[in-house]
């Protein structure tokens, strides 16, 4: 049986392409990349616990790395096909990689985003024992009332290409990514604790690349726990 995450990924890839105004068949053979924030869902363990028969396709059907590759295979896309797992920031890092690949010419277009499904309680139990989950089941990002985060499921993909190319095609354009940046906090208070100084640095780097004065920004969204 195929991991539900892979099935959903195929569905949302198709939706993203159509929403952008393209026919999936028109992308066949093109330098279109696939960059997906993904991770282990535990579906393989679920099958093992149910004593499901191991088939020749079992390894591929339950591997997170196969998700984006299955999209590339199904749609015959010839650009890079990469799974990205950086925990809470996986989707944003996937989009960063997609943008960089388009800018350097590795691909002309890209499907980028992330997906997360939870089929076993193991992760919840671990996070709860670590004191990371909100008792109210709500994220209170940037609030002094924050008491943890809510671990959830979801999927979201963008279809990306250079602005001039998108305008020439007459596709549905939601917005323009002016710039992006990525780094790591290095040594912090603990393995999972953010490093505020390095977070500030990566934000500055993104502003600089985009050529945007921070004073002109009036709306900000933050990923995951807001870290």
What label would you give each PLM region?
Residues 1-227:
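Condensing-enzyme catalytic core of the thiolase-fold
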